[in-house]
Amino acid sequence: MSDNQRIRIRLKAFDHRLIDRSTREIVETARRTGAIIRGPILLPTKIERYTVLISPNIDKDARDQYEIRTHKRLVDISEPTDKTVDALMKLDLAAGVDVQIELLNKKSGA
């Protein structure tokens, strides 16, 4: 790959154990191929809360509360080699983890 490119990997999952395991696998795979890693960077957890009335008729005080937590991680791979890209493509991650991969150009001043 070109020297002025880097790979940014964003991971999302509802279960923090799955996302941590997947992040660890990505970092170990990239390090084995000789790439430079920045991260994993923990991004803010998005919490969505829902309140539902239990009683269909009266008693508005009876409610249940639910929440969904979306955990996010970010991994930057600088100076990726062709071996790095091949190893990342062959990597088998958990089904509950959403992976977004971006190919970025490094800025000339950074």
Curated annotation (Swiss-Prot):
A Pfam entry, by short name: Ribosomal_S10
Task: Cite the entry's keywords alphabetically.
Answer: Ribonucleoprotein, Ribosomal protein
Q: Which GO terms describe its biological process?
A: translation
List the GO terms this entry assigns under cellular component, sorted alphabetically: ribonucleoprotein complex; ribosome
Gene Ontology MF term list: structural constituent of ribosome; tRNA binding
Q: What does this protein do?
A: Involved in the binding of tRNA to the ribosomes.
Database matches in HAMAP family: Ribosomal_uS10 (MF_00508)
Query: What is the official name of this protein in its record?
Result: Small ribosomal subunit protein uS10
